[in-house]
């Protein structure tokens, strides 16, 4: 941000110095410039390189940004003919790198205008920032344009079915506003599912889950089958603690290294009658909060993970506002296994027992019956 302001002040000084009524200076005509939304690009570049937990370098970020600028220049009627400067292979912002990059982008923009193309500075900037973040793909890193268009850095796609409530069994009620519903299946397997970790207003998913578990116990439940397919987010704060006893759940990694380990809150552990055998179903449509919930259980061998690998969205982001209403969100932390040290962000949580969507519930029931 400070560099962007300094650049803006410098630009104003240049304009003031050239605004005279007399003849041109003997030094020649000032370099022609186009509107490339330079402040937007500067702030976005600085935020991305300074904050990215994956240590994106100035070189990789600006090369990706310049490649995107070339593509957009051609799309707007210009040419992609500009040399790539020698950027620094450093994970810190480089003033000279950005100056060289901005000069190259200016050449492309002027080329569009000279060719009579339909030049749009906004589209140019959107394409550049959107291309830049692809150099460090992560589900939390994204660019949101002033018009509200979301450009993701990661090409990972959400795949798989949503949770499928079995036809048989005794209903436990629902679904409620978080999609929480369940059944006690033959043999005492309590099937529970919800599609969002909701904490809003008077509704708390942890309290609602405890209530439905208590209802299942009253109906003779002997094991928990938690189906988190299609659960893409929310806040899983402390919910894993309900089934653990103070064990470490995940380790937070920042750009500068280990940022601490989270442990289950013993005060939130459910009473002994709730501590039944447990299986959790995941697939490529399980992400973020559902992964955090499953992570601590898997790391501590409290539950058997059944199904397919989860999406792999385990981290946190920092939102950075940009001029004009746009913003760039950068991944600043990722979560790894507190016990094993395994990295799950951008990789997904692998199942202990593989099963496709059609057979996952049956496979989980089979496993739980062996543990009752």
Task: For each feature predicted by the language model, list its residue ranges.
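Low-complexity, Gly/Ser/Thr/Pro-rich intrinsically disordered linker/tail segments
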Residues: 352-372
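Short, surface-exposed connector motifs at secondary-structure boundaries
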Residues: 114-115, 220-225, 273-279, 300-301
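Gly/Ser/Thr-rich loop/hinge elements
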Residues: 232-285, 314-327, 332-339, 343-344, ...
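Short beta-strand/turn micro-motifs composed of small residues
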Residues: 228, 282, 307
């Amino acid at each position: 941000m400070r560099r962007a302001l300094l650049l803006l002040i410098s630009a104003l000084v240049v304009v003031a110095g050239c605004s005279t009524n007399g003849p041109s200076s003997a030094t020649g005509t000032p370099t022609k410039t186009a509107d490339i939304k330079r402040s937007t690009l500067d702030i976005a570049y600085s935020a991305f390189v300074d904050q990215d937990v994956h240590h994106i370098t100035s070189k990789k970020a600006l090369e990706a940004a310049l490649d995107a600028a070339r593509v957009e220049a051609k799309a707007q009627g210009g040419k992609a003919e500009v040399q790539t400067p020698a950027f620094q292979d450093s994970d810190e912002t480089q003033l000279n790198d950005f100056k060289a990059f901005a000069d190259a982008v200016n050449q492309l923009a002027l080329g569009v205008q000279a060719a009579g193309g339909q030049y749009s500075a906004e589209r140019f900037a959107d394409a550049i920032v959107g291309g830049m973040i692809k150099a460090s793909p992560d589900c939390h890193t994204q660019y949101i344009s002033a018009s509200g268009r979301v450009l993701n850095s990661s090409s990972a796609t959400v795949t798989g079915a949503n949770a499928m409530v079995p036809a048989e069994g005794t209903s436990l009620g629902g679904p409620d506003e978080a999609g929480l519903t369940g059944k006690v299946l033959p043999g005492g397997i309590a099937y529970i599912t919800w599609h969002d970790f909701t904490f809003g207003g008077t509704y708390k998913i942890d309290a609602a889950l405890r209530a439905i578990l208590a209802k299942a116990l009253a109906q003779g439940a002997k094991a928990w089958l938690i189906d988190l397919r299609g659960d893409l987010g929310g806040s899983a704060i402390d919910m894993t603690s309900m089934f653990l006893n103070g064990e470490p759940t995940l380790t937070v990694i920042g750009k500068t290294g280990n940022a601490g380990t989270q442990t289950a809150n013993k005060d939130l552990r459910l009473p002994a009658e709730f501590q039944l055998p447990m299986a959790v179903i995941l697939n490529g449509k399980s992400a973020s909060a559902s992964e955090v919930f499953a992570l601590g259980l898997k790391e501590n061998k409290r539950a058997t993970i059944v199904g397919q690998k989860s999406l792999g969205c385990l981290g946190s982001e920092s939102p950075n506002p940009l001029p004009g209403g746009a913003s760039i969100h950068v991944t600043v932390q990722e979560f790894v296994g507190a016990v094993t040290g395994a990295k799950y962000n951008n990789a997904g949580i692998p199942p202990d027992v593989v099963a496709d969507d059609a057979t996952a519930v049956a496979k989980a029931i089979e496993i739980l019956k062996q543990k009752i």
